[in-house]
Amino acid sequence: LADDVTFGVAPATIVFSQLYVMEYPSFLESLRPVLPYAAFIIAAFSALRLAKFNLDERQSTSFIGVPTPANALFWGSLIVFNPEWLTVHSWSVFIILALILITSYLLVCELPLFALKFKQWSFKGNEVKYVFIAFTVIVLALAIVSEGAIGFLQAWWLIILVYVLTSLFL
């Protein structure tokens, strides 16, 4: 339950708050009172993921579906630390709603995702992990140099996106 509150309800509440205050296209104004509640799909699917995969023994060297902490980090980084893109365009609401559906699906789908678990430290057999770690360090360093500490927090949504896309093509 604590994991669902931390990694499901908390990001859902963040997304709810953003959907509540953001601009809507005029034809969606009548849905303004109800659309923010779509954010709680994140909490429901996070709970479902935790129930489905918590005792799954197939995840010893990789993950199946996006882990809830990664999903929470994605949403926190995207919404809390990158709010300016959400206020520029009224169509941003569509991006948020689409991302709610996509990320919720990725939580529970049977997609294998590499884990940063090492059985041995040699490069051979761990190439993807080491390249991903190098990518993460470079992105975070560039973000810190360009934006300072806030850049560190802003960059995580991109890192999570690359993590999922990399796993898709392995």
List the model feature ranges, each with a label:
Residues R49-L55, S62:
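Contiguous mid-protein beta-loop-alpha structural module that forms a pocket-lining wall or clamp
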Residues F27, V34-F40, F53, S92, ...:
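Generic hydrophobic alpha-helical membrane-segment signal
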Residues Y37-A39, Q59, A72:
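N-terminal signal-anchor transmembrane alpha-helix
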Residues Q18, M22-E23, N54, R58, ...:
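Membrane-interfacial segments
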Residues L1-A51:
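Multi-pass membrane catalytic core of lipid/isoprenoid biosynthesis enzymes
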Residues I42-F45, L55-R58, I100-L106:
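Short, functionally important structural connectors and interaction interfaces within domains
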Residues T61-L170:
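C-terminal membrane-associated helical module and adjoining short loops/tails
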